[in-house]
Amino acid sequence: MGGRLSDVSAYHYSWLGHDIADGITRDIRSGMDDLSRDLSDNFDDSFDELGREFDDIGRSIHDRLDDGVLNESTFSEIYARKLDLEVRRGKAVIVYDAPADKIVVSSEEDMALWNVYSEEDELKVTVGSKSWDSHDYKDTVIYIHVPADYRFEKVELKVKAQSNNKIINSDNGPAIVAEGLKAGKIEIDASVGAVRVTGADTGKLEVDSDVGAVQFEGKVDGDVDTECSVGAVKLDLAGAKADFNYEIKCKVGSITVDGEGFSGLSREKKINNGAAKKMELDCNTGAIEVKFH
């Protein structure tokens, strides 16, 4: 004869609920661990592919520098204490090879495809328009040449979608490459496309990835704040894990800090190492990986 749930004593009902909850929790955590491993594997594969694409971009850039006649705009340092770079179509490259006291923005493409001007002490560079005009289908590459020891007060690197439903892929997606970038603060906003910064030296780092991919390698003297929606962020920082205190939020995505994984957190996880610096990591369904060297 079948029993009813109400026939179970309160004591046994309590333990029954406890066992069911434990079973569900174990299943969820097992599933989240599997998902985390899958995301981590896909994350590594994606960045391997991204690395190859950046290498191809680098070769293309050097070929263009060798072959092209460039359009140039030159600014003295007092008009470029800050840099605001936004790429909606094509590629932008920051290199530290300019003469002293001069910052040069150049491209072999017509200046109708890119724009540069100084507003007070901020240099503003835009590649590609907000809409897909016919000439925007050309893959524009611009170069920002900076003096070897120059340190910006603040740098903003943004890759954005254009205002329509055109598909963005590795062939036409926006990308920024920066080597040896120095700034009091670096902000990276990857709505789409990709940003790679290597050999950087900054006082503070902020990264926001929507569906874009971000690679950052370098030294950060202060706090790090990283948010990732469905994109991917990879940080390779000078120093050690213990140099930071941590605030970690992760839903369905994957966060890895120096080999330790975090996923499916029901609430924010705080780690206090008694450090002078703080790292905030917030991931929705994407992936964040932090390594130290």
Predicted ranges, named:
Residues 83-85, 169, 188, 248:
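Active-site alpha-helical segments that house and flank conserved acidic catalytic motifs
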Residues 73, 121-129, 264-272:
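Generic recognition of long tandem-repeat/solenoid scaffolds
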Residues 2-126, 137, 141-167, 175-178, ...:
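Short linear S-[DN]-x-LW-Φ motif typified by the pepsin-like aspartic protease active-site region
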Residues 156-201, 206:
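Right-handed parallel beta-helix
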Residues 133-135:
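Acidic/histidine-rich helix-loop elements
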Residues 89, 98, 109, 120, ...:
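A mature extracytoplasmic/lumenal domain signature
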Residues 91-92, 164-165, 173-176, 193-195, ...:
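Acidic Asp/Glu-based divalent-cation binding sites
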Residues 181, 197-293:
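Short, surface-exposed interaction patches in beta-rich subdomains
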